[in-house]
Amino acid sequence: LHSRSRRQRQMCIRDRIGAGSFLFHSFAQAWAGALDVLFILLFTLLYLFAASKDFMGAPRSIALVITLGYFPFSIIVDWLTLPLTFLGSTRIYMPMLILIILFSLLLYKRLPIVSRGLAVGTFILVISMLARILDVPLCQKIPLGTHFVWHFLNAVMLAWMIEVYRRHIISQN
């Protein structure tokens, strides 16, 4: 992410996440919802690949296998979290949350600064998810709800995770 072209690509993905969310919340159509989810998934997969390669030191081929493993991992996590009905549709973010926690724990001794950065990302995501979970119940009392907090914290979390990666790459050079 330290070269200009990489930074531009990263910003392009980040901006597409925002555009997908904007389109979904503006038009509430299936195609817009698909774009919203697709861009988040794309970022997740790219970050997982980069984290596997650059944080964990995995060769590209192993990083690719880990990245593709996200799909069966997500299915298993989805199945295991089915009883947690209070999560509602926020449940789809559980695989990301678990992976960030897992990477943070695995990197605790080898890359403590990255580990702490990922732990901060975990905290931001948990608070963000809580805002999303509480949105509908709180709408009865607070008409504005908390959905905007979800989006704001997601933007903060996205920027933070990119910054954790950027700092790591710079520290390696």
Whereabouts are the PLM-identified features?
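Membrane-interface junctions at the ends of membrane-embedded or membrane-associated helices
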Residues: 51-62, 164-173
